[in-house]
Regions:
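Alpha/beta-hydrolase active-site loop
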Residues: 59-80
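Alpha/beta-hydrolase fold nucleophile elbow
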Residues: 79-91
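N-terminal cap/lid segment of alpha/beta-hydrolase-fold proteins
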Residues: 1-21
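Glycine-rich nucleophile elbow surrounding the catalytic serine of serine-hydrolase chemistry
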Residues: 89-99
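Hydrolase active-site cap/lid region
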Residues: 99-144
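The feature captures the conserved acid-bearing segment of alpha/beta-hydrolase catalytic domains
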Residues: 132-191
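Short beta-strand element of the alpha/beta-hydrolase
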Residues: 23-32
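C-terminal catalytic histidine-bearing segment of alpha/beta-hydrolase fold enzymes
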Residues: 176, 180-224
Length: 224
């Protein structure tokens, strides 16, 4: 029987879902803990601990990454977890997963990105509350965001230099997080630079649904 543990850490809610027989390995989903989680539920049944730290509306900012690292150090000790996590970054959660791995690659064993936001110039949309939150969190303006070098798409070289195994899943008709400028741009970079990553591009698929109807390839990626 799984055990769901909720508590506050540094002012933000943490959720740790412990399997009946934990194996020390853990999935850290950076946003939307229970959304499209067939793969996570299967992995839980195989002994993986599921972890979520609710620091929403920080969009993977430098502040968010520092909070994540503090939480990481706490959670591996408190729950006797492996010192490398497996990051799952869905949509805006891709910002957190990418940036945490960028700054703390030694803390990450694998990354699964699903329809990730990799360029904040393309999402959130201008005029939205989310966009205003991005400006505040990153200390940006409508002008400075255009030349900001902290977008994940500006940091592919350093990110891929760490050699962290990556699985990228996205829909090629994403109407919310434009494929061409986000997941598509990552694929183009990998192709142009001879970098091999596991990927599954869903033809004529929009932003939703995330994940896959058959999550076998996700399970295999995590366990291989």
């Amino acid at each position: 029987m799984e055990n769901v543990i909720k508590y506050m850490f540094n002012g933000y809610e943490a959720t740790v879902i412990r399997p009946e027989n934990p194996n020390g390995k853990w999935i850290w989903k950076t946003e939307f803990l229970y959304a499209f989680d067939d793969a996570e539920r299967e992995l839980l049944s195989r002994g993986y601990t599921r972890v979520y730290y609710s620091i929403s509306n920080k969009y993977g900012s430098y502040h968010a990454v520092r909070l994540m690292h503090d939480f990481y150090r706490h959670v591996i000790k408190e729950f006797e977890l492996d010192d490398k996590c497996i990051l799952f970054g869905f949509s805006r959660g891709g910002l957190y997963a990418f940036n945490f791995a960028l700054f703390y690659p030694e803390c990450v064993s694998k990354i699964y990105l699903d329809a990730p936001v990799l360029d904040m110039r393309t999402w959130p949309p201008e005029g939205s509350e989310n966009r205003e939150q991005v400006y505040k969190e990153y200390d940006l303006t409508p002008e400075t965001i255009k030349t900001f070098k902290g977008h994940p798409v500006e940091n592919f070289a350093e990110f891929f230099s760490h050699g962290i195994p990556l699985y990228l899943i996205a829909g090629d008709s994403d109407e919310i997080v434009p494929f061409e400028y986000n997941a598509g741009k990552m694929l183009d970079y990998c192709f142009d630079n001879g970098i091999r990553i596991k990927n599954y591009i869903k033809s004529r698929c929009k932003h939703h649904p995330h994940s896959l109807y058959d999550v076998k390839s996700i399970i295999e990626f995590v366990e291989e």
